[in-house]
Amino acid sequence: MERMIERCAGLDVHQATVVACVLINEPGKRPRKKVRTFGTMTHELEALRDWLAVERVTQVGMESTGVYWRPVHAVLEEQFEVIVGNARHIKNVPGRKTDVKDAEWIADLVCCGLIRPSFVPSKPLRELRELLRYRRKLTEAQAAERNRLQRLLETANIKLGSVASDVFGVSGRAILRALIDNAASPAEMADLARGRLRRKRDELANALNGRMDDTHRFLLSMQLRRVEDIEALIEQLDQRIAEKLTPYQVEMALLVQIPGVDWVVAAVLISEIGVDMSVFLSVHHLAAWAGLCPGSHESAGKRKTAAARKGNMHLRTMLVAAAMPAVRTKGSYFKDKYYRLKARRGAMRAAVAIAHKILVAAYHMLARRVDYRDLGEAYLDRIDQTRTVANLKRRIERLGYVVSIMPKAPEPDTDPPLAAAA
């Protein structure tokens, strides 16, 4: 293999150690390798950085192994060009495997320019990404705790969820606290209802006439407190996220124009893909990186169905979730596209396809700095008509005819003229 870089290094990163191999290519001489092992404490990583600087290394390569690569990258990124590669792309040939051999293999790949760099956003975007990913975890924990609470109510035969549309609204929480205190009758608890729920007080009183014991009340108090604690954490996170989003207000204003994209989805898009679309070769590469492109499986000239490739799980999950409110937008292109695909391919594949469309729209809006333009619900009908005409024309021409297609002339108006007013 042709060696392109004179001085480079490969790192095999683990939880407690980093094995570093410096590869030196001097004209007219055989390549030389220097291998050292460092710990992963901050002062040890700084010693690694100083050693690489003494060896005049210009590029450093490593695998994206879990989260262990992140502290190493943070120490080295200011002084070296750091290439973080997908572990599946760097895998060595079968044979004896040691940490030293892995570091040497990575150094060889860096030297020959054979590692495809993974997308590593800037530090502000990495911080925003950490906040949003933790917010998602809290949201999932909140949903799980709410489900546990409602299952507990069903166990005690409290049918609050059958009458109230939102168990955790103002009325629902007041009733839950009354259930915990055990100081009111079902009719008195029904009087705590507010708004439209007051019209259902009789039905609500019957729903609250269950069989709650002390254990149920104890668990209910803990679960309600847990839900409220998570809500407080999410509120604090939202404030910090809003501060981090201050430099990206223009991009946020563009992205929220897309149907189904609220401020959370827009923030996730910015944190996961950034705002500079030039880091992706094309919109197709971005879709593949996100795991939203169709699978490709071709053998012996035959194309077969295949699952979508693995990609950015956080981005993919958020966009698939955003697809459902997007398809509920009346008169939108997404709605028509979803129901056409759902009839042929099923609901899940249709949702993934809409998520792909949202990502494509976001890419072009960020790359060109343009507003969102909906194609409309009738767009696919017009496309279908054009394709049908072209297919029929082609079939007739194969039979030896010359076809000229013109639009139909409007029919003359046959209604009698109205009599002039006297």
Place the predicted regions along the sequence by residue.
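A detector of single, family-specific signature residues
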Residues: 1-422
